[in-house]
């Protein structure tokens, strides 16, 4: 599982390289049975469990067969809505909490294979999280959707908030299955 290989490396790099007073990291765990034993600890890291998001559980229960496997055909990750729902529900869970708090800050998603190589402070983040911009992401040229291993949402901007609401809605209502691909990046 990628989380076992990349997740711990990411967390170790964050603890060593992020300025603790500048950031708050919310880590969504899957399959840890409600525990976070053995994971790096820091005052700015909060562990949460995907299993506690009821809408995610409902989606998986309703759509367990939408897992990229169709009969004898080879696995197709582009049609694995179950795999890609985790990110959508984690992002939207935190977003709705921040919305209730009337946060106007940036909310940034980082995939578990993101490694911080040098010291990272708020001033560094400010270079890419520009106040006048709704969303920042890693664009691609040769593929028709963005790399979503890094995506930032300016919660002070209506369009960023609307996108998060719409993305969550696409999974809550199963609208995602009207698209030709079911990954979070495509939807």
Give the location of each predicted region:
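Short catalytic/ligand-binding loop motif for oxyanion handling, primarily in non-cytosolic enzymes
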Residues: 5-6, 34-37, 116-119, 124-125, ...
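Short beta-strand-to-loop element that shapes/binds the nucleotide-sugar donor at the catalytic cleft/hinge
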Residues: 126-155
